Amino acid sequence: MARRRKGDDIHGWVILDKPLDMTSTQAVSAVRRIYNAKKAGHAGTLDPLASGILPIALGEATKTVPFAVEGSKIYRFTIKWGERTTTLDREGEVVATSDVRPTPEEVAAVLPDFTGEIQQIPPAFSAIKVDGERAYDLARSGEDVQLEARPVQIISLQLLDCPDADMAVLEMRCGKGAYVRSMARDIAHALGTEGHVAALRRIRVGGFVEAESTRLDELEEMAHKGAASEALLPVQTALDDIPALAITEEESFQLKLGRSIVLLPRQAQELKAQRRPREIAGKDCTFTALALCDGVAVALGDARAGKFQPSRVFNLTP
């Protein structure tokens, strides 16, 4: 019996515009099938009831997922006033109601209280583990799940529209770990009412933006025409804010063997000039950098004391 083919060596990022009613896992499987890729993963789960940006990594790009996940995210969402549900979105059962309908002015007035570093209690229906079990599994079994508040960073929060008295459309830019559903609940409570997320769309993840995204049906059509590669972004796309180091073929060879390379004074200065503000403010002189040979990612590593030590090597060819 012939061995089943494992897939092709496809490397890069596909910025999928995930449709509603599809899990992130299903989306990854669909993209992996289209490209017949050996390996695939995604940068940040998007619930079935949400649409929008789902960056999908293929092949060697999966090694950069941790960096993509750390980037800020932008969500556009609609709060429906007057009803809180078990899941804090339109899928759950209504558990609390209110006749209070805030005005646009009242909504805008409370938003500054929810920016910066705030304490947020995650939804009971979330993937957070409680004593080794997922919170949503416990909640579905009928248990009263009590999660502790944790710090999250809300970079910006603004009111976009109030189409009617029952709805408000907002946009939030946040750091890792923030929940839109919790934000909707907390804003509603601050306004003396109840609320849940009626619609949710993610429009940015780190450096990945909506304009670069491709719908699944478009991707399938491109694949049918033999043009799926047009939607594939380079592996290093998720590493745009990391200092880049141009190296020679010989240096590339050494790094792929796991050996460090010596930085020329010029290279060291160029890397330092590219450092991010938080790295400059830190006391440690070590910082992460990306080595590139002819524009192709070779390795991620630590630059320190005139040397570059690889920590993660990419198996890519020019």
UniProtKB/Swiss-Prot annotation:
Entry-linked CDD domains: PseudoU_synth_EcTruB
Residues at the catalytic site: D47
Catalyzed reactions: uridine(55) in tRNA = pseudouridine(55) in tRNA
Enzyme Commission number(s) from the entry: 5.4.99.25
Coiled coil: none
GO process annotations (BP): mRNA pseudouridine synthesis; tRNA pseudouridine synthesis
InterPro entries hit by this protein: PsdUridine_synth_cat_dom_sf (IPR020103), PsdUridine_synth_N (IPR002501), tRNA_psdUridine_synth_TruB (IPR014780), TruB_C (IPR032819)
Pfam families: TruB_C_2, TruB_N
The entry's keywords: Isomerase, tRNA processing
A GO molecular-function descriptor: RNA binding
NCBIfam families documented for this protein: TruB (TIGR00431)
Matches recorded under HAMAP family: TruB_bact (MF_01080)
Family indicated by similarity: Belongs to the pseudouridine synthase TruB family. Type 1 subfamily.
Stated role: Responsible for synthesis of pseudouridine from uracil-55 in the psi GC loop of transfer RNAs.
Name of this chain's protein: tRNA pseudouridine synthase B
Species: Maricaulis maris (strain MCS10)
Gene: truB
